[in-house]
Amino acid sequence: MLLRRRNGPCPFPLLLLLLAHCICIWPASAARDRYARQNNRQRHQDIDRDRDRDRFLYRSSSAQNRQRGGANFALGLGANGVTIPTSLEDKNKNEFVKGKICIGTKSRLSVPSNKEHHYRNLRDRYTNCTYVDGNLKLTWLPNENLDLSFLDNIREVTGYILISHVDVKKVVFPKLQIIRGRTLFSLSVEEEKYALFVTYSKMYTLEIPDLRDVLNGQVGFHNNYNLCHMRTIQWSEIVSNGTDAYYNYDFTAPERECPKCHESCTHGCWGEGPKNCQKFSKLTCSPQCAGGRCYGPKPRECCHLFCAGGCTGPTQKDCIACKNFFDEAVSKEECPPMRKYNPTTYVLETNPEGKYAYGATCVKECPGHLLRDNGACVRSCPQDKMDKGGECVPCNGPCPKTCPGVTVLHAGNIDSFRNCTVIDGNIRILDQTFSGFQDVYANYTMGPRYIPLDPERREVFSTVKEITGYLNIEGTHPQFRNLSYFRNLETIHGRQLMESMFAALAIVKSSLYSLEMRNLKQISSGSVVIQHNRDLCYVSNIRWPAIQKEPEQKVWVNENLRADLCEKNGTICSDQCNEDGCWGAGTDQCLTCKNFNFNGTCIADCGYISNAYKFDNRTCKICHPECRTCNGAGADHCQECVHVRDGQHCVSECPKNKYNDRGVCRECHATCDGCTGPKDTIGIGACTTCNLAIINNDATVKRCLLKDDKCPDGYFWEYVHPQEQGSLKPLAGRAVCRKCHPLCELCTNYGYHEQVCSKCTHYKRREQCETECPADHYTDEEQRECFQRHPECNGCTGPGADDCKSCRNFKLFDANETGPYVNSTMFNCTSKCPLEMRHVNYQYTAIGPYCAASPPRSSKITANLDVNMIFIITGAVLVPTICILCVVTYICRQKQKAKKETVKMTMALSGCEDSEPLRPSNIGANLCKLRIVKDAELRKGGVLGMGAFGRVYKGVWVPEGENVKIPVAIKELLKSTGAESSEEFLREAYIMASEEHVNLLKLLAVCMSSQMMLITQLMPLGCLLDYVRNNRDKIGSKALLNWSTQIAKGMSYLEEKRLVHRDLAARNVLVQTPSLVKITDFGLAKLLSSDSNEYKAAGGKMPIKWLALECIRNRVFTSKSDVWAFGVTIWELLTFGQRPHENIPAKDIPDLIEVGLKLEQPEICSLDIYCTLLSCWHLDAAMRPTFKQLTTVFAEFARDPGRYLAIPGDKFTRLPAYTSQDEKDLIRKLAPTTDGSEAIAKPDDYLQPKAAPGPSHRTDCTDEMPKLNRYCKDPSNKNSSTGDDERDSSAREVGVGNLRLDLPVDEDDYLMPTCQPGPNNNNNMNNPNQNNMAAVGVAAGYMDLIGVPVSVDNPEYLLNAQTLGVGESPIPTQTIGIPVMGGPGTMEVKVPMPGSEPTSSDHEYYNDTQRELQPLHRNRNTETRV
């Protein structure tokens, strides 16, 4: 009708409708606008008035909500859920149908700033929601008329339900069936945790008629004024653990009288009417249901075990709710896997029915804000995986550094984000971030006080690219003007959203002027809320949907600085930005560019950039680095090159087979292998090298040849060594043609002999070439060869004696001729005339001597005269000469004899006669330096331990006149000790000062004040035994094998110095740094004699389980016995500090070792290392390896540690770090009284400041050194019991062969001394000289029982005979340290037994000074043994 009359006059009804609109609608709209403005002003007043109240903490949740209650700032909310489609048909009528999934909240009981807006948030969050993923909190609803119908569709809550301060009279959850209780609510004052908790509410009824199951947690009701019917509910039917509900009512007024349940209700009810009767599916079941659910009372009416809250039938499809997972109307224990095994093909294949586990639901695809990992929807990837396209995939190499988010950013946690790429969680910057605050723990105890955060420290976020949760900014500070430190942030995933307004990016009431997050490309989930920022510009012009992933994501940007004021202030986008807006001022802050984008900066044209080109209509890109100008991508589009051009490409340098010719690459000569020019030689402008080259005699290259060419005539082929460093270095590893020897025309190597020279330049003589034939040769010009002439010829024309030109001796003419002729050549040469021509004729000078048949005239007389003259002349010369020589010799000998007699007379008269002959030992002088320091230079700290004659302190050495502090350990000799202890003290200093090695504890100095002190390096990390026990999970194979190698190196050094340690164990190896260990305890080390390889001890405790059998039986100690102890020490390391033979008594060890007992193979130890350890435990000492061999073996192991030790997680083990700050703290503790201005120095750097730099294992020692086992107890307390692993004074029976001995053995398997004191021991102690001279009987002890003669225990005693009171002893006749008797007799050592010393105790086995210093006495009837 309206269409037919559209051109005619308006009908009357339409006029009335228009009038009604003018009268009613417009005033209503105006009133609504006025109400909105008034409400807005009221809201600002409420926010300002409630700023302090925002921090109000309810007593059960104060610690969890200290970040400011004003977080609930929302002014509006849009629902943000995940809809999961279902394939159920309507005819199934199954109640378990998932629809919309909503995210729960975590704000507990925090008070909202605006309760009306709080109600709107709840309404928008849960409208049409059927599945709450998290907690459902219904709080602070004081208006009893509020509509709660938005709760009608909720069927399942995965967390807990909290109802607090709700005044609505009736709260109804008509379809709620199950509360899973995966997260529970708890009051801090009580231990109970609740899945349903109702408190301080004035509602009359809480109606949940379909609630069937609470899988975890309890139910509680606390101080509810009017709530009825809750006490009638049979909670054991609902709560899975079967407990009853918790009720508490503390008000003075009595509880409200509640109406009775409907008559149709068999037990309890939720409210009035039959629909609120409690339903039962557990208490009414048959016993055959085994405590599960049922759908009837009969035995066969039990629900499936996967059902929760009851069922309608016996199968998995009949469940009302699922206990584990819901998969298309079927309850399952697990979701269908994404991959399944194919038994036919034996491979894993993709499962077409596979689904992901999301909460208690199986879904085909995970929600957009979650990640896929191993068939589950997760919020973050595990440590070894990274997010790639919404799926967790293994990292290719190191994973991007991921840091956990924080509830509030403050000065205490900001440094944890340094170098982070991904923040797994949320970032919140609040007012207290910049003002500081006092932390309060969940148990209401005071936490740390955080200082205000300097805004400059926020630069740590410059490396962050992703935030998996949300970013919340609510802080103000004068310097907090922008978010430029998030300039590299690319994605906010929003896997966790703020409870108010579902915000992923929320900036409220901040002091920001601009955002400047120029690289933010996407907000995957959640809304954008930017409100009440009075100085913030630019945000209103940003097109937020361009960076939001889903269209339903909301944006609230309002009540910031007005656009006209921003424009007035000039805080507007650049003219190069398009309508999408910008993050701040500048052309690099645009979301998109109006013209062109060049590396994130907007420009008007690509021509403004010299080395850029137009990639497309919107993008400029930089030219290739080798292009100075270009017209496209790649080095082949260059218009001008930066370096050189090779064909169509610009390159940084010419390829190997080309050279640079004024910016263009030209081909090298064909024979070159790389070049700088066109020539075919080697040098500038020629080849760099070539495969084959002809060289001159001066080793310069004449020209290059091709690889397959042959050397020309006159040259030979020669290989150039790869290490060549001379003029032929460019040809190293290649070949050259070297010129033959000048005497050789054709050759195969340099030389002129037949083996290398095939043709001579001039002549050949035998096997070598000659320039010309020698005089004793003749020349064959045709063959150009020299032949040897006849021996009797002087010049010849042939090889025979008849070819001579002249003779060496005599000519022999033909016998038929009557006489020689001057020009006759018919003769032979001979060395001796024949009998028939035995006469030599010298008459003809031109002919020379020749053989003749008859003598010449007067030849006989002439011959006789010549012989006589020779004898006369010879005799006349020789006889006088001999006589003169004899006379001179006699006179010299007489003078020498007189001079000796004069010297002897002079020495006798002057008293300088030396009757003692020299006995040179050929041993060099010990020139090691021993530094002496003053007592005032030392600052002692706490006691590290005690020994038999001293204490060990940690301390600091401050050298006088120098501004330096050195951490040291100070060993101080007690004043109560005697002279013998002082001697032993100095002997230890002598040994430690004489030996210097990187793996031996270094003696720094000695203090000779009233109390003698040794100053050594301070080992900050204690002994290696404790270190491996305390850091077992952090020690890898590399560290273990490095320590083993270092111990072997230190012991190899002692072996070279002929020192026997005697007590090598892990407890006597100290740790300076995690990479450096040092062997300690030289107090028991003994120097071997130069003519002996063993040392025999007469007393002292012995670590039985660390010693070789010969040590236990005969007390014989050698370097090979140290090898046995080394094997046990390495076994301790590989077992991380286990005790050897822990369950075997020490008294049984000798017998068991003799029958083949060995330590078992450690779990992490390979067979290679264990075989090495077994070689150290050979019963025959000669079969054991040396320490030099062990050093080589373990160094080889350390090069491939993973091959020889199998430690779980080896690659992830990291030893504890040791920082310079720890060093400074230690110095502050050790020397608190110093002014602190001194610099900290390493002991090695201080003592050797000019050492050449090089690799060194020395590091700073700045930590406290644990107690050394060597100094365990106060030696003055002789009755004390140690009670530890190092000592045990109880005696034990030890077996040696078939002999059983009752010997004292301590708990650490140390064999106690067996010698007993003589009856006059006390007197001898008071008079050592008398004791030394007296003969003391040998007491019956261990050494006597086994029949081994007692040996010299202290050879160094002979060095100090006067000190020890042996004044009458003859001077030793051998080297220092080698005890030798001065007469024909022998020597016997008689040692007193322990017990005669009143101060002796079990812990003195390291400092057994009385036994070690016993004087030696001579006995002519005994034999010397060393």
Swiss-Prot record:
Keywords: ATP-binding, Developmental protein, Glycoprotein, Kinase, Membrane, Nucleotide-binding, Phosphoprotein, Receptor, Signal, Transferase, Transmembrane, Transmembrane helix, Tyrosine-protein kinase, Ubl conjugation
A Pfam family the protein falls into: GF_recep_IV
Cytoplasmic side: 890-1426
Bias type Basic and acidic residues, positions: 1257-1276
General function of this protein: Receptor tyrosine kinase, binding ligands of the EGF family and activating several signaling cascades to convert extracellular cues into appropriate cellular responses. Known ligands include spitz, gurken, vein and giant-lens. Transduces the signal through the ras-raf-MAPK pathway. Critical for the proliferation of imaginal tissues, and for the determination of both the antero-posterior and dorso-ventral polarities of the oocyte.
PTM per Swiss-Prot/TrEMBL: Ubiquitination by Cbl in response to high spi, promotes its interaction with Graf and thus facilitates its GPI-enriched endocytic compartment (GEEC) mediated endocytosis and its subsequent degradation.
Impact when changing I101A: Increased binding to spitz
Top-rank taxon: Eukaryota
Naturally occurring in which organism (per UniProt): Drosophila melanogaster (Fruit fly)
Binding-site residues, ATP: L944, G945, M946, G947, A948, F949, G950, R951, V952, K971
Entry annotation: catalytic residues: D1063
A Gene Ontology biological process term: dorsal closure
Cystine bridges: none
Outcome of swapping Y1095F: Weak interaction with EGFRAP. Very weak interaction with EGFRAP
Modified residues (Phosphothreonine): T902
Lineage: Eukaryota, Metazoa, Ecdysozoa, Arthropoda, Hexapoda
Glycan attachment points: N128, N241, N419, N443, N482, N569, N599, N617, N816, N823, N828
Annotated EC: 2.7.10.1
Residue numbers spanned by region Disordered: 1232-1297
Location of this chain's protein in the cell: Membrane
Gene Ontology MF terms: ATP binding; epidermal growth factor receptor activity; identical protein binding; transmembrane receptor protein tyrosine kinase activity
Membrane-spanning residues: 869-889
Residue intervals on the Extracellular side: 31-868
GO cellular component, one term: receptor complex
Catalytic EC class: transferase
Signal peptide start and end residues: 1-30
Protein name stated in the entry: Epidermal growth factor receptor
